[in-house]
Amino acid sequence: MAAHLLPICALFLTLLDMAQGFRGPLLPNRPFTTVWNANTQWCLERHGVDVDVSVFDVVANPGQTFRGPDMTIFYSSQLGTYPYYTPTGEPVFGGLPQNASLIAHLARTFQDILAAIPAPDFSGLAVIDWEAWRPRWAFNWDTKDIYRQRSRALVQAQHPDWPAPQVEAVAQDQFQGAARAWMAGTLQLGRALRPRGLWGFYGFPDCYNYDFLSPNYTGQCPSGIRAQNDQLGWLWGQSRALYPSIYMPAVLEGTGKSQMYVQHRVAEAFRVAVAAGDPNLPVLPYVQIFYDTTNHFLPLDELEHSLGESAAQGAAGVVLWVSWENTRTKESCQAIKEYMDTTLGPFILNVTSGALLCSQALCSGHGRCVRRTSHPKALLLLNPASFSIQLTPGGGPLSLRGALSLEDQAQMAVEFKCRCYPGWQAPWCERKSMW
């Protein structure tokens, strides 16, 4: 093993050099990428506050917009004629997927995609954010139960003499069949129009591991969730990336349960990818810089539990999302800038560089380092005794300077193994595949 480890005795990295490798496809052969999905250009345009993420090796659209060449997100009102119910129970575009026109939806979606992504060779992230209903009947609880109620009512109106169990079974089949047609059809159209885009739905898969108050909380997906997710194989098969949410609920603050929560949510994404027959399907969890629905920034240990945990499991990257509400005032923009400059940015540089160095040292530069199950707490963070972050004279990207010691490399080999990129194989990804 020691013979394989690369003798990186004087490896110097600068973010400028790393960023130059981005042109072309966004993710291939890139161990870990942080994508900025925030409208922070408002901070500059409206408040004169420049939240500069480029110096920390973060990928952002020109002008830091929600939609651009590197990252485009479609909310429900921006793609086709998504059917849903308002909070007052009023149907929009038919309310139910089985009560709406898929043909009309795809026709409008065709135009919406061409307008939002004009470049035919678009190779960025293409995320669809539909949250009103879920494609599995069993997952539509609480406020989403209206979709089950209205589905039953639709069948009952057509067959008033049917018994309740028959109505339930047919309503479930109709809803799930229509939900599949809508979601799969939308992905298929996106892939046909922009075939290099990383198409996928935000929030899928979900682990539903929200039982934080349990005294024996482990973070594992509750019983039955994996079986339900396995029924969504058609969704994983049509997706070109998976975008699970690892937003930190506010109730987790100070509990010490965050790492378990994130660990199993990210692991479920990798599990469904393998189950769907595509172990190389990119996983890019969505992360907020705040605890969800608060203005409390994630402290450093929670960044380790979210970004760091994702990188350690071999995620292709993360998507950092910031609500427009967090950029409404000059004070909030200044707070984001300070957090980026002092806490978030240096951490991103640390974990991104750690993933790259591990890939080079352990995986011949042809794969990602993935944490071994025997070391569930290991992270791809640089040894502060070996590396330092330095300002570039006159501004510009920060420089990460240092060298991997033999001890650093040996520890990586103990704690991590390789997941090879497509086209490479062997324990250290040193051989090209024959297929």
UniProtKB/Swiss-Prot annotation:
<feature type="active site" description="Proton donor">
    <location>
        <position position="131"/>
    </location>
</feature>
<dbReference type="GO" id="GO:0009615">
    <property type="term" value="P:response to virus"/>
</dbReference>
<dbReference type="GO" id="GO:0070062">
    <property type="term" value="C:extracellular exosome"/>
</dbReference>
<keyword id="KW-1015">Disulfide bond</keyword>
<keyword id="KW-0245">EGF-like domain</keyword>
<dbReference type="GO" id="GO:0005615">
    <property type="term" value="C:extracellular space"/>
</dbReference>
<dbReference type="InterPro" id="IPR017853">
    <property type="entry name" value="Glycoside_hydrolase_SF"/>
</dbReference>
<protein>
    <recommendedName>
        <fullName>Hyaluronidase-1</fullName>
        <ecNumber>3.2.1.35</ecNumber>
    </recommendedName>
</protein>
<keyword id="KW-0732">Signal</keyword>
<dbReference type="GO" id="GO:0071356">
    <property type="term" value="P:cellular response to tumor necrosis factor"/>
</dbReference>
<dbReference type="GO" id="GO:0006027">
    <property type="term" value="P:glycosaminoglycan catabolic process"/>
</dbReference>
<feature type="domain" description="EGF-like">
    <location>
        <begin position="354"/>
        <end position="430"/>
    </location>
</feature>
<keyword id="KW-0964">Secreted</keyword>
<feature type="disulfide bond">
    <location>
        <begin position="207"/>
        <end position="221"/>
    </location>
</feature>
<dbReference type="GO" id="GO:0045766">
    <property type="term" value="P:positive regulation of angiogenesis"/>
</dbReference>
<dbReference type="GO" id="GO:0036120">
    <property type="term" value="P:cellular response to platelet-derived growth factor stimulus"/>
</dbReference>
<dbReference type="GO" id="GO:0004415">
    <property type="term" value="F:hyalurononglucosaminidase activity"/>
</dbReference>
<dbReference type="GO" id="GO:0006954">
    <property type="term" value="P:inflammatory response"/>
</dbReference>
<dbReference type="GO" id="GO:0030308">
    <property type="term" value="P:negative regulation of cell growth"/>
</dbReference>
<dbReference type="InterPro" id="IPR013785">
    <property type="entry name" value="Aldolase_TIM"/>
</dbReference>
<dbReference type="GO" id="GO:0043202">
    <property type="term" value="C:lysosomal lumen"/>
</dbReference>
<keyword id="KW-0510">Mucopolysaccharidosis</keyword>
<keyword id="KW-0458">Lysosome</keyword>
<dbReference type="GO" id="GO:0052757">
    <property type="term" value="F:chondroitin hydrolase activity"/>
</dbReference>
<feature type="disulfide bond">
    <location>
        <begin position="358"/>
        <end position="369"/>
    </location>
</feature>
<keyword id="KW-0225">Disease variant</keyword>
<dbReference type="GO" id="GO:0046677">
    <property type="term" value="P:response to antibiotic"/>
</dbReference>
<dbReference type="GO" id="GO:1900106">
    <property type="term" value="P:positive regulation of hyaluranon cable assembly"/>
</dbReference>
<dbReference type="GO" id="GO:0000302">
    <property type="term" value="P:response to reactive oxygen species"/>
</dbReference>
<dbReference type="GO" id="GO:0045785">
    <property type="term" value="P:positive regulation of cell adhesion"/>
</dbReference>
<dbReference type="GO" id="GO:0044344">
    <property type="term" value="P:cellular response to fibroblast growth factor stimulus"/>
</dbReference>
<dbReference type="GO" id="GO:0030207">
    <property type="term" value="P:chondroitin sulfate proteoglycan catabolic process"/>
</dbReference>
<keyword id="KW-0378">Hydrolase</keyword>
<dbReference type="GO" id="GO:0030307">
    <property type="term" value="P:positive regulation of cell growth"/>
</dbReference>
<keyword id="KW-0326">Glycosidase</keyword>
<dbReference type="Pfam" id="PF01630">
    <property type="entry name" value="Glyco_hydro_56"/>
</dbReference>
<feature type="disulfide bond">
    <location>
        <begin position="420"/>
        <end position="429"/>
    </location>
</feature>
<comment type="similarity">
    <text>Belongs to the glycosyl hydrolase 56 family.</text>
</comment>
<dbReference type="GO" id="GO:0071493">
    <property type="term" value="P:cellular response to UV-B"/>
</dbReference>
<feature type="disulfide bond">
    <location>
        <begin position="43"/>
        <end position="333"/>
    </location>
</feature>
<dbReference type="GO" id="GO:0005975">
    <property type="term" value="P:carbohydrate metabolic process"/>
</dbReference>
<feature type="glycosylation site" description="N-linked (GlcNAc...) asparagine">
    <location>
        <position position="216"/>
    </location>
</feature>
